Curated annotation (Swiss-Prot):
Low complexity bias: start-end ranges: 574-587, 685-701, 985-1019, 1132-1145, 1174-1186, 1271-1293
SMART domains the UniProt entry points to: COLFI, TSPN
Residues of the signal peptide: 1-35
Gene: COL24A1
Organism encoding this protein: Homo sapiens
Matches recorded under Gene3D superfamilies: 2.60.120.1000, 2.60.120.200
Domain Fibrillar collagen NC1 stretches: 1515-1714
Pro residues bias spans: 496-505, 893-902, 1466-1476
GO MF term list: extracellular matrix structural constituent conferring tensile strength
Listed name of the protein: Collagen alpha-1(XXIV) chain
Compositional bias per record (Basic and acidic residues), positions renumbered to this chain: 1256-1266
Pfam families listed in its UniProt record: COLFI (PF01410), Collagen (PF01391)
Residue span of region Disordered: 487-1481
Domain of life from the UniProt record: Eukaryota
Amino acid sequence: MHLRAHRTRRGKVSPTAKTKSLLHFIVLCVAGVVVHAQEQGIDILHQLGLGGKDVRHSSPATAVPSASTPLPQGVHLTESGVIFKNDAYIETPFVKILPVNLGQPFTILTGLQSHRVNNAFLFSIRNKNRLQLGVQLLPKKLVVHIRGKQPAVFNYSVHDEQWHSFAITIRNQSVSMFVECGKKYFSTETIPEVQTFDSNSVFTLGSMNNNSIHFEGIVCQLDIIPSAEASADYCRYVKQQCRQADKYQPETSIPCTTLIPTKIPEHSPPPKLFAEKVLSEDTFTEGKSIPNIIKNDSETVYKRQEHQISRSQLSSLQSGNVSAVDLTNHGIQAKEMITEEDTQTNFSLSVTTHRISEAKMNTKEKFSSLLNMSDNITQHDDRVTGLSLFKKMPSILPQIKQDTITNLKKAITANLHTNELMEMQPILNTSLHRVTNEPSVDNHLDLRKEGEFYPDATYPIENSYETELYDYYYYEDLNTMLEMEYLRGPKGDTGPPGPPGPAGIPGPSGKRGPRGIPGPHGNPGLPGLPGPKGPKGDPGFSPGQPVPGEKGDQGLSGLMGPPGMQGDKGLKGHPGLPGLPGEQGIPGFAGNIGSPGYPGRQGLAGPEGNPGPKGAQGFIGSPGEAGQLGPEGERGIPGIRGKKGFKGRQGFPGDFGDRGPAGLDGSPGLVGGTGPPGFPGLRGSVGPVGPIGPAGIPGPMGLSGNKGLPGIKGDKGEQGTAGELGEPGYPGDKGAVGLPGPPGMRGKSGPSGQTGDPGLQGPSGPPGPEGFPGDIGIPGQNGPEGPKGLLGNRGPPGPPGLKGTQGEEGPIGAFGELGPRGKPGQKGYAGEPGPEGLKGEVGDQGNIGKIGETGPVGLPGEVGMTGSIGEKGERGSPGPLGPQGEKGVMGYPGPPGVPGPIGPLGLPGHVGARGPPGSQGPKGQRGSRGPDGLLGEQGIQGAKGEKGDQGKRGPHGLIGKTGNPGERGFQGKPGLQGLPGSTGDRGLPGEPGLRGLQGDVGPPGEMGMEGPPGTEGESGLQGEPGAKGDVGTAGSVGGTGEPGLRGEPGAPGEEGLQGKDGLKGVPGGRGLPGEDGEKGEMGLPGIIGPLGRSGQTGLPGPEGIVGIPGQRGRPGKKGDKGQIGPTGEVGSRGPPGKIGKSGPKGARGTRGAVGHLGLMGPDGEPGIPGYRGHQGQPGPSGLPGPKGEKGYPGEDSTVLGPPGPRGEPGPVGDQGERGEPGAEGYKGHVGVPGLRGATGQQGPPGEPGDQGEQGLKGERGSEGNKGKKGAPGPSGKPGIPGLQGLLGPKGIQGYHGADGISGNPGKIGPPGKQGLPGIRGGPGRTGLAGAPGPPGVKGSSGLPGSPGIQGPKGEQGLPGQPGIQGKRGHRGAQGDQGPCGDPGLKGQPGEYGVQGLTGFQGFPGPKGPEGDAGIVGISGPKGPIGHRGNTGPLGREGIIGPTGRTGPRGEKGFRGETGPQGPRGQPGPPGPPGAPGPRKQMDINAAIQALIESNTALQMESYQNTEVTLIDHSEEIFKTLNYLSNLLHSIKNPLGTRDNPARICKDLLNCEQKVSDGKYWIDPNLGCPSDAIEVFCNFSAGGQTCLPPVSVTKLEFGVGKVQMNFLHLLSSEATHIITIHCLNTPRWTSTQTSGPGLPIGFKGWNGQIFKVNTLLEPKVLSDDCKIQDGSWHKATFLFHTQEPNQLPVIEVQKLPHLKTERKYYIDSSSVCFL
């Protein structure tokens, strides 16, 4: 076993070589020991429990990591290392594997093999989602992220399924990467000094976090060495198992006890670790090499390839002188091949023309001439290998192949006879290295400066993608030339299957030759033809090296032998040479439908085509179905600004119509002034992602921009539609095989050509380069199942997976340069219309824009809903007859219409002979209007024929000419109602009849059954509106009458007066059909015209089904600012608002001087009836009764109870001491005037109160500081005494007021007159009895005193006297929009609302072409005469909408002066009609939209003959503002109801300081009230929010985590009581040994455990469970904590097991938060 020793020709090792080999072996052993002694750093895999430190230099038996501990998911251990799958996730605190003070410099040593191409992190160190350090493995790069700064990027790829080992050194100012055992490539990126890592950091192996992409592959080694010197020679630190992982076999660290293993894969990739490796280290990537192994004495000796060629030596290869390459600078000395013995230790490389033997001179001359033919070898940073010289001359290989193979084989055979294989081997080595196939140059980032040269680096000849197309070919060519039959190596790993070679022609049987040395496994070729069994060969020589015999002649084909045993799986064969293209084969059968292929790469966008010429205008087609919203049309040229028209007279107020379609975009008007801010709109829904526009021309590299923040991960895009297939091309002639040209630019995917003639089956070619992705084809039919194919190559990366979760914040990337301004992108598709936003306030009127040109006629829209009746239009002339439509399907009979007035009889025309129906021709262009024809003569009425059988439908005939109208015939008697016939062809439309007389209002009819829908008829002309009569009750639905003859159009009638709105009647019974009208006068006979082909008038078809509403139009551009609308009328009284928030508590005022009782002032004017107020303060209390037990909260009901009986006056209490003025209270709601109470008994004289100064009445503003008291104001005039009001409903129970602080004893005052009942004071001391005094003069009403501090709950007081009605308070400011509330329960029927405002009249539009019925718009003014249409079907009767819900409670008004009780008001006027459709909840949008839409006419352009008079809308505006103010007040002052919940109970106490305990609704997160919860508010305890359990025996509270967390945040303390009822159970609270106590625990909301004798020990209120007398007892535990998130208790742990004599159960109280 002599390493690197030269041998003699006879194979013996020379003595000198033996000595040197021994010395080398000793040196290697010492070096290995030194390496063992050095510090090996921190083994991350060992720290994570994935391997031991002894793996580093242990034997293969000990190199397997221990698997005694359970491995994480997705992690497996092998001899090569740790396998990570896509579900592997290993994360651990940083301090467990690395020291916190790990500073610079340090080296990261890694050995790995990637199994999947992705951009995963090898490892990462994070602190609070901030990346501190990470190594990311991109498809073509390796990135080192450091503390969020600019990362260091290396052009090094590990995703090639090969083993890689590299070292990364991080210093103070640089990051370096070392590959190939010390070749250094510096990063020019400078970074600030990295500090030590935080102790809270987290180390993640295989990914950046759990949500990111995971590394998939094998990690053999991951060490962190705290020094930078280890990176220069990091191969000394490589683990033994990593050296054996397929490729790593360095000679510098061989342990003394282990030599190089003999089992080395002969096709394993060359190592990328060691600097001593030869040229192949920079050129091999695919792992295909011919190992330099010889076999001698059963020992395997690896020889180092030290054949690096410098730049200066490349010129000799170019000039053709390959015979004497001087390689002495690299430790390679040229030597003649025919020498007896040489004691040099280096093998020599001789690429010369010296003879291998005299007879084999021809081989090397051809080989050298082949090398000399390379003319394109440059002197750049290239690498030269024997194989790379073949890259430029692929066409020569077939010429030299046969001779070269034969001669080289003979040369090798001859040299083996003379022991000269050793000298021949360098020739093979230099010929079998291929150029790199990596996507980046040399698989590393080479940052040499220009002109710099490294002596230990190699330089590739061709380093672009151009070389990769032919690497396989020449590699296989040389393998075919030099069949390594004589160099047997160990069996390698199974490689991917190579393409099958062509079947060889059976040759003649050769002579039996001597047995040679076993060769390596050959490439699996196609099976040849069976040959005859040859004669058995002589046994070969076993000792020593056998002498191979000469090659025998080719033998005859042997007979097919018996099938042998199945052999071992062969090694991966080298790809064969590409065969000549065979002729086209016969098309095979259709294969099975393949699985969907991977998505192709994004193709380059084609050039944008020029717009085609504008086509001629086509005919107007028949109306199609409503298409999708088309693209926005081009904007028309602004027209000339027209003159301002005269102001028209005011039109009749029209009904509110449906919202019309969006008009075309007008020209932009002048910029108007800044309008007031509008109400915030609702958030629109996200529209669909528009299509990706074509990519623009790539711009130049921009300047580096600032690093942006990581964006939100976008949604997954929708799958695109498959493109259309291109047109097939014509088959071309078969061309000659040309020289392969350099790869061109990546072209577009061309159209597929036509199928050519079938050719002969050609040999399979080598795998070509990755093609461009083709279009997704149409799935073919399932073909027969094919045979199982060979194992395929690794496929391309799969399609992107599903959208991942939100990743953690990534590192900050490098600043990119600012790119140039890109071309404006194409206009995107219009997104879906968002929800309608709030209407903005009416802006100032802008300038009138120019009238745009008439746009092109749009596609017919769908038939819209029937609009409101417009103003009477002028009589239109009859339109031209349309083509006869096809016969419609018989529909359902429509609902009977209300009998209308019978018009005058028309002139019946002659019934023309029915012609054969013709085929419907194409729709012609619109013709000009023809002149009106003369009236025809009256024809003679024909006799009524017998009813014939219904014939079959004939073919469509041609449309006949329109006949002249015939003479009017006599009206026949109405015949019997016949059976309804099939729907006939549509008849010609008649002229409009005269306007009928106004019919009497019929009796109310019953609602008829809704009939089936009829066929949709053609739209008729708009009828003339009749005079508006009184609204009658709905008549009964009459039966369908026979269709009458169409009468002549009547003269336009005068505009009728607007009638009064009648009350809405109840549906009446079915009415009788009306009588026939009188017979009209005979008209003049018309000219007898030719017989027309008019069809018979068909029966009315069934009503058509309501069409699907058309797509909502895109929102139009913002119009010009309209004029300021008129002030609206005063709106109806809004619903009461919510209670406002409480203001700050005022400072205690100084005690004023005692004032005299003032005189009773005159009564003020009666005020507006106020809103229903809270219950007044309790009256004087009686003697305190015994305190009753706490009652259960009453049921929550929205219906108020009946008013209670009037109470008796209570006895007069003792005179109390006057308390000090309390804190200023908040004004209560103005109460509804109540009944005047009975006069109470005269109370004791009170001490004169302090005279306060009259305060100024200010507007309602924000909560400000307490103002100074103003001077006393004059008393108001006495009001007119009001009538006795009706007994009002019982008000909501008011909150109990607090008792005032006891005042000082009062002085004995003189007897006073009987005063008004005073505010209840605190309990005073017993005063002296005063003598009854004379009645005094009535004093003026004193100012309300400040409310006292809240006292204890008092008894129910007697009802107080009704207060004087106050004046109406000032209007509050507009409030903010409140949050969206849940749909509430159905409210009680509301009163009729005030009649709404009438809308303005629309403006006339320009005359347009006759089109299909569009969406009904707002009723416009009288338009031009339109074409006459057919009568449409009767519409369905609308459904009466539900009654609107009761509005929220109104805002609390200011306290007014007390007035007398007013009289009961009259009922209000009836309300306006409700909006169509059910309305669940009135919101702010409805009020504002109705207000603004009433002024839409002001925003339109003025047309002449249109007069607009502004209507005073001030009342409506004030109603709206009042509603908004109430709405804002209700938000600021929650009521604790389900629709208006508070956050916590304390908010209710702060807003209303007089509230009583009970159930209320709260919503801690203030979202939609749907998740509000009902709680018990204990205001007596300061406003506790108490959550009752679902059941007293369960520790469940039915509150979600979100609401509970918000409740915890809003509270400062919590209380919970748990009672355990026990029967013969031991004590619960003692843990001492003296008693059988049980150390039970209580688990809180946040998981903490309450136990006895701990910091979280509950307070034991009672523990009677120690009494075990056979009776039930209880133990009560109180949990009170300042950390509310600890409560409620959700589990009781360690309870004893239940037995027959031992029982217990648990009661839970409400948990209360304060």
